[in-house]
Amino acid sequence: MRLRNKPWAKDKIAAYPQYVIPDPEARRGRWHELFGNDRPIHIEIGTGKGKFITEMAKLHPDVNFIGIELYPSVLVSALDKLIESELPNVRLLNANAKDLTSFFADGEIARIYLNFSDPWPKKRHEKRRLTYRDFLALYDRILSADGDIHLKTDNQSFFEYSLVSLSQYGFVLAAVQLDLHRSDIVGNVMTEYEEKFSAKGNRIYRCEALRPPQQS
C-alpha cells in the first residue's frame, strides 16, 4: 500500500484527544470508564480510513468500538468521519498491534476484526502477518472467554495461511466463506478495500474463529 505523506496528520490527531486516545496504556482494564458503560468492546486492527468501524458503530449502538491504525496519514481520514458523525461508541488509537496487551487487559475485548490485512506474501515477512502465531497469542490474551476473531481478505494465500495458523494455535473455526458476496451471510458491512476489490470481481474470503477453549 502506497501512502500519501500528510505532514500535518500527527498535529491534527493530537488536536482531538477525545477521539484518538493519546494514552491507551492508562486505559488498560478501564475502557468501560471511558465509554461510560459496560457494553462489549470490539476492536478493528488496521482500521484504515474508518468506513467499516463507523458504519458498524451506527448499526450497533450497543457495542463499543476501538479502531487501531499504525499510520497517521491514514488515521486522519477515520478521524474526519468520527468528527462528522460524533459517534459516542467509537474511539481510535494511533498504535501498533504488537502493543495490544499494553492497551487492553486480559479478557477485556469481545471481538477482533481483521479486515484486508497486509498479506506480507514473502516468507521472510511471515512474522509481520496479523495471523502469525505471535499475534494470535496477543489476541488470545485480550479476548474474553467467548470472544472471537472476524477476518476478511481478498488474498487466497493469506486466507489459507490464516486458517491453518488459527487452527494450529487452537482457535475454533466457526464459519468459513470462500466467496462472501455469494454466500447467505446477512448484514455484511464493507470496507473501502472490499468495495474496490469486489467491484473488480475479486472473490472475498471470510472466517470467524472462536477463542481457544480454556483448560479447567
Swiss-Prot record:
Catalyzes the formation of N(7)-methylguanine at position 46 (m7G46) in tRNA. It is an enzyme of class 2 (transferase). It catalyses: guanosine(46) in tRNA + S-adenosyl-L-methionine = N(7)-methylguanosine(46) in tRNA + S-adenosyl-L-homocysteine. The gene is trmB. It comes from Geobacillus thermodenitrificans (strain NG80-2). Its EC number is 2.1.1.33. Belongs to the class I-like SAM-binding methyltransferase superfamily. TrmB family. Pathway: tRNA modification; N(7)-methylguanine-tRNA biosynthesis. This is tRNA (guanine-N(7)-)-methyltransferase.
